[in-house]
């Protein structure tokens, strides 16, 4: 079923939209939120002019560029969330369909791309809104194998595994490990005539192994021995990865952290890409599996409508926002139609058949090359959409330079009296450490609050690389002073549960999150 916003009754649908930047200068293909209240937005080179100039004297000279050998336009920018102002950044080589991940020190690792960027490794060391930090291309190291459409995942020791890519059915690491790239036959086995194994979904399980999903199959992979520990049953419903991608999340880790549940939703019908069929309806099925079970099976459920290129965003509450994308076609340039304006809320703890809620629709088509990222204030930043090889504004689905924010229902004004405010919390905690969080709430707290850690992933191509939500073990919430409460929290026991790095720490009261404070988790 293809849903038309014009014929749907819109009364009482939850959520609100706001335009925060009318012209970012670039269409963001890749987006990441830093601990300084800024957002890195990244497109690609070899496309000619963007709509944001580099500072005078900072032009990029690249004899290999296919369009501009002397390029004075920015293809990356940084957004200050406090002022909504944009500052241009400079990238040197092509980051088209590349991958990324934050490192334990808070720097953003960015790998691969196309053409002269396919083996490059870049870093962005974030700074405050008044700083002048910029991209750095590493000169002393590069990828062993060119990586285009790969996926990055931080590991328990803080290193990063880089999985797959076009004509790269292998894995490698940053920092580089002895032996270079290691073949992963699973990626070759699931490749079909239209690929469908690119940008694989990679989740770090609490047992330390990786859940790797590509096309319609998944394995549990022990990267330390390069062995497949478990082959999961195939997921019904067609391919799920680029160029047929839906999206995927690992649900919140909680309790004793031993159970990990993976959800995969949406995707294109097989053949839509290779036939260049823009009107083939996307499928709306979702599969949910307990990846740590000794006998895992997929539990199937259906979204209210089909979706290709949706983004699944873990909210601070443990619910999942599904947003962006189209209802027909596939990924690729000008290969989709029927924008999917309606977000969905997936509520994991509801019974099967009652987990999806349709939310207030947007008005801006967010098609191929769109992104969605959780912000520290609980909103979700929506950026990008460029279903064309170059920037093209006179089109049915134009290159999109606007940045929006979607506010879930928990940010509504009628929740203000139960919304917690974190007054005190540590800036750094060690694995397994007990620590206090002090919060204020206007109305008396009933029961216990949650304290949840949310990673800052690298969002691109309908998958947030490194996305993670960990619900901390907490003591009963006890009064400390007027409208103030003390929560004794225990940090995750190790990097298998939450790899070292910076996390947004939210207090959640009756399903309403605070504004997050950043905390660094260290061994």
Swiss-Prot record:
In the record, what terms sit under GO molecular function?
A: aldehyde oxidase activity
Q: Which domain of life is it from?
A: Eukaryota
Q: Tell me which UniProt keywords the record has, alphabetically.
A: Cell wall, Oxidoreductase, Plant defense, Secreted, Signal
Q: Which GO terms describe its cellular component?
A: extracellular space
Quote the catalytic activity from the record.
an aldehyde + O2 + H2O = a carboxylate + H2O2 + H(+)
Q: What is its EC number?
A: 1.2.3.1
Q: Answer whether the UniProt record assigns the keyword Transcription to this protein.
A: no
Tell me where it resides. Answer: Secreted, Cell wall
Induction per the UniProt record: Induced by infection by the grapevine powdery mildew E.necator.
One Gene Ontology BP term is: defense response to fungus
Q: Where is the signal peptide?
A: 1-19
Question: Which InterPro entries did the record assign?
Answer: Gal_Oxase/kelch_b-propeller (IPR011043), Gal_Oxidase_central_sf (IPR037293), Glyoxal_oxidase_N (IPR009880), GO-like_E_set (IPR015202), Ig-like_fold (IPR013783), Ig_E-set (IPR014756)
Its biological function? Catalyzes the oxidation of aldehydes to the corresponding carboxylate by coupling the reaction to the reduction of dioxygen to hydrogen peroxide. Substrates include glyoxal and other aldehydes. Involved in disease resistance against the grapevine powdery mildew E.necator. Is sufficient to confer disease resistance to E.necator. Can produce hydrogen peroxide in response to E.necator infection, and this may directly play a role in the defense mechanism during plant-pathogen interactions.
UniProt name for this protein: Aldehyde oxidase GLOX
